[in-house]
C-alpha cells in the first residue's frame, strides 16, 4: 500500500492557530483591570492649641480616589490623650469639603482630606498624615461621591449614626466620615464602615460582616464625651461607581476583624484585616472603636466618652502604614485609643473592602 503525503497538515495547523489567536487577543484586550497606588505626602503637624483642628490632604496624580485614611502621631506623655481623628473624606480639590445638600455631591474625586482635632490637650508631637488610595481601572473609569449628614451628637456621652447609600446600579468602592466643629473638643467620628441599605443590616446600623459581598452603603458614627453643642454635625460619604458599567464584571468582598480593647486609660490598640489574592484589590477600608458585635447588632459606642480613632490606613500584615507610592497593598489597619479614662468593654474594629473585576459578581 502506497503512503501518500498528508498535504495541507501544516497549513491546517496554522489556520487553527490563527483562529485561536483571533479569539484570544480580543479576550486579552478586553480584560478588566484594577490597580491601586497609595499616595501619602507625610505628616501635617498640629493642632498646636486645645479645641482646634488641622487639615491635610493627599492627591492622586493619576486615577481616582477609591478610599483613604489617616494616621496620627500623639506623643508619649499624658497629652497623648488629646489628639484624635476628626475626619477622613474625599474632596474635589484637596481644600474644600462636600458639606451642603445631601445626595450625589461630586464626581471623579481625585483628592483625600484627613482632619485631626486636639480636644482639651495639645502637644508639639501631634500630627495627622493623610492616605489616598488611587484607583486606575479600565472598567471603573468614573466615580461619584454621595454624602449624607445629620445634626448631632449634641448631648454628653451620646452618638449619631448616618448612612450614605450608592445609587441603584452602581458599586460601592469606599467611603469616609467627618464630624464638626473641632471647637467641641470631645466630638469625633468613632466609626466609618461599609454596610448595606437593607432590613437585614437595619439600613446601615449593622456593619458589613467578614466575607459579605457587595455592600452598597457607608456609615459614619459621631461620638461625644462630656461636651455639648447644638451645631454639631456628622457626615457620611460613599464613593460609588457610575451606572454605566456592567455589574456582572464586578464584585466586592468585605474582610473584618474585631479585637478587644483598649480598656485602660491612656492606652491604644490596633486591628488589621486584609484581602486575599482571589478577592481582588484592596480599594478602601474602615475603622471603629465600639462596644463590640458591630456586624451582628446595631452599632453601639464604648462605655466612656474618651475612646477615639487615631488612625485608619492601608498597611502591611503587621499594621505598619503603607508608604507613599506603595502599589496594591493588601491590608487595612485601625488604630484606636481609650483617652484619659478607663473604658471597659471597648473593641477595636477594622474593615478591608476588596474589589474583583476579573471574576465578576459573587452570590
Place the predicted regions along the sequence by residue.
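Secretory targeting and sorting signals
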Residues: 2-31
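Extracellular attachment/recognition segments
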Residues: 32-363
Amino acid at each position: 500500500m502506497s503512503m501518500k503525503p498528508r498535504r495541507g497538515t501544516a497549513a491546517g495547523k496554522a489556520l487553527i492557530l490563527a483562529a485561536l489567536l483571533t479569539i484570544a487577543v480580543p479576550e486579552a484586550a478586553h480584560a478588566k483591570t484594577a490597580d491601586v497606588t497609595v499616595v501619602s505626602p507625610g505628616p501635617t503637624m498640629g493642632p498646636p492649641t486645645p479645641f482646634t483642628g488641622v487639615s491635610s490632604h493627599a492627591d492622586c496624580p493619576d486615577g481616582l480616589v477609591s478610599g483613604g485614611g489617616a494616621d496620627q502621631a500623639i506623643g508619649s506623655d499624658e497629652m497623648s490623650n488629646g489628639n484624635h481623628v476628626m475626619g477622613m473624606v474625599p474632596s474635589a480639590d484637596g481644600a474644600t469639603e462636600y458639606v451642603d445638600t445631601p445626595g450625589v455631591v461630586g464626581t471623579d474625586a481625585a483628592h483625600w482630606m484627613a482632619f485631626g482635632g486636639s480636644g482639651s490637650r495639645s502637644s508639639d508631637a501631634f500630627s495627622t498624615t493623610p492616605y489616598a488610595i488611587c484607583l486606575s481601572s479600565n472598567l471603573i473609569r468614573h466615580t461619584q461621591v454621595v454624602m449624607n449628614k445629620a445634626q448631632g451628637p449634641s448631648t454628653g456621652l451620646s452618638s449619631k449614626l448616618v448612612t450614605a447609600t450608592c445609587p441603584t446600579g452602581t458599586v460601592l468602592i469606599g467611603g469616609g466620615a467627618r464630624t464638626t466643629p473641632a471647637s467641641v473638643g470631645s466630638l469625633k467620628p468613632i466609626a466609618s464602615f461599609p454596610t448595606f441599605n437593607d432590613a437585614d443590616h437595619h439600613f446601615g446600623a449593622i456593619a458589613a460582616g467578614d466575607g459579605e459581598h457587595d455592600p452598597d452603603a457607608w456609615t459614619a458614627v459621631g461620638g461625644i464625651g462630656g461636651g455639648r453643642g447644638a451645631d454639631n454635625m456628622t457626615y457620611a460619604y460613599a464613593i460609588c461607581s457610575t451606572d454605566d458599567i456592567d455589574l456582572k464584571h464586578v464584585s466586592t468582598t468585605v474582610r473584618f476583624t474585631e479585637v478587644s480593647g483598649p480598656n485602660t486609660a491612656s492606652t491604644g490598640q490596633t486591628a488589621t484585616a486584609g484581602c486575599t489574592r482571589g478577592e481582588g484589590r484592596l480599594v478602601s477600608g474602615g475603622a471603629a472603636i465600639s462596644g463590640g458585635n458591630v456586624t451582628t447588632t446595631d452599632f453601639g459606642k464604648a462605655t466612656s466618652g474618651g475612646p477615639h480613632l487615631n488612625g485608619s490606613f492601608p498597611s502591611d500584615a503587621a499594621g505598619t502604614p503603607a508608604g507613599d507610592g506603595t502599589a496594591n497593598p493588601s491590608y487595612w489597619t485601625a488604630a484606636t485609643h481609650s483617652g484619659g479614662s478607663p473604658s471597659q468593654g471597648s473593641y477595636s474594629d477594622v474593615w478591608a473592602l476588596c474589589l474583583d473585576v476579573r471574576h465578576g459578581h459573587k452570590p
